[in-house]
Amino acid sequence: MEERKPRAKKNGITRERVIECAFDELKENGWECWNARQIARRAGCSTMPIFRLFGSMDELKKEVIARALKVYEEYIYGGMREEKPYKGTGRAYIRFAKEQPRLFKALCVTEEFTGQSFAAIDPTIGRVMREAEKAGDVRGENVKRLHACMTIFVHGAGVMAASGSHLVPDDDICDLLMSDVFQALKAYYKLPQKKRESLAEEEKGETTE
């Protein structure tokens, strides 16, 4: 027999209603203000129905994280539908940061809300890596390194966008910069291993002079 989820009937407060209010609280005010009292105020009830339905805030948090990841997925998979899917994912990541700054910070910037690194919970990483492999025409460890370098650039732009920094270039300039960085990385990781090692040694020599 299927186990029924608990329902707080008083004031019509249901699990879905609490999850919706908890998600909206995170989306609008960030995880710093995310607590039972604020969620209850938004839902129009006391904190009692929340704990009756969920038992703990950690249980509710898991539901909210899952919903936030769904929003993130929509952005990234939308980017994959562009003419250049891998580049599209980078554009989508920055767009997510700009349009959903508090969700971005809660998921991608700090581990205090999720309790683990974003790389560990990112539901899109498998497909993104496959697109990186196709776009970069590189394999194995090289595609991992290429993607790691691109992530540093794109994440940095995302953090600036989420903070409203005036240093963030407009979309066209950001697009050009992303292309330049990608093409440089692609060319580098297509070089033979010995050539890359030689370049690295030359770089070390220059920095020690």
Spans of model-derived segments:
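Basic, helix-initiating cap at the start of DNA-binding domains
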Residues: 1-29, 37-38, 59-62
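Amphipathic alpha-helical packing segments from all-alpha helical-bundle domains
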Residues: 88, 111-140, 144-149, 175-186
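Append "Primarily bacterial transcriptional regulators
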Residues: 34-41, 50
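Helical hydrophobic small-molecule/effector-binding pocket
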Residues: 86-108, 116-122, 151-154, 158
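N-terminal intrinsically disordered/low-complexity leader segments
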Residues: 1-13, 189-209
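Amphipathic alpha-helical linker/stalk segments
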Residues: 62, 66-89, 125-134
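Amphipathic C-terminal alpha-helical segment
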Residues: 103-106, 151-169, 183-195
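HTH DNA-binding helix-turn interface
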Residues: 28-31, 44, 51-61
